[in-house]
Amino acid sequence: MVPRCQIDVLYFAKSAEIAGVRSETISVPQEIKASELWKELEMLHPGLADVRNQVIFAVRQEYVELGDQQLLLQPGDEVAIIPPISGG
């Protein structure tokens, strides 16, 4: 069985509106795919399914696509849900 850890999730823009919070602490497996982490968040906030294709994670300030990338999380890690970024 994979050990679990507490991580801090930060929500921005539409994801914060849907979740109704700007941040929260949740317990997740330490070893988890990015897509599985997203599913855990959708279970907490089902409306997040609406923005799944519009966001990426930032894990310890590194961008991570919501795919099959394996994450090795540590207690207290910060995972941000980043909305689309436009630049010019």
Curated annotation (Swiss-Prot):
Q: Can you supply a Gene Ontology BP term from the record?
A: Mo-molybdopterin cofactor biosynthetic process
Q: Where Glycyl adenylate occurs along the chain?
A: 88
State where the protein is found. Answer: Cytoplasm, Cytosol
Q: Which GO terms describe its cellular component?
A: cytosol; molybdopterin synthase complex
Q: In which pathway does it act?
A: Cofactor biosynthesis; molybdopterin biosynthesis
Which keywords does this chain's UniProt record carry? Cytoplasm, Molybdenum cofactor biosynthesis, Nucleotide-binding, Phosphoprotein
Q: What is the recorded post-translational modification? A: C-terminal thiocarboxylation occurs in 2 steps, it is first acyl-adenylated (-COAMP) via the hesA/moeB/thiF part of MOCS3, then thiocarboxylated (-COSH) via the rhodanese domain of MOCS3.
Q: Which GO terms describe its molecular function?
A: identical protein binding; molybdopterin synthase activity; nucleotide binding
Report the Pfam families cross-referenced here: ThiS
List residues, modification 1-thioglycine. Answer: 88
Q: What else is known?
A: This protein is produced by a bicistronic gene which also produces the large subunit (MOCS2B) from an overlapping reading frame.
Assembly and interaction partners:
Heterotetramer; composed of 2 small (MOCS2A) and 2 large (MOCS2B) subunits.
Q: State the function annotated in the UniProt record.
A: Acts as a sulfur carrier required for molybdopterin biosynthesis. Component of the molybdopterin synthase complex that catalyzes the conversion of precursor Z into molybdopterin by mediating the incorporation of 2 sulfur atoms into precursor Z to generate a dithiolene group. In the complex, serves as sulfur donor by being thiocarboxylated (-COSH) at its C-terminus by MOCS3. After interaction with MOCS2B, the sulfur is then transferred to precursor Z to form molybdopterin.
**Can you tell me which family this protein belongs to?**
Belongs to the MoaD family. MOCS2A subfamily.
- Provide the protein name: Molybdopterin synthase sulfur carrier subunit
Q: Which gene encodes it?
A: Mocs2
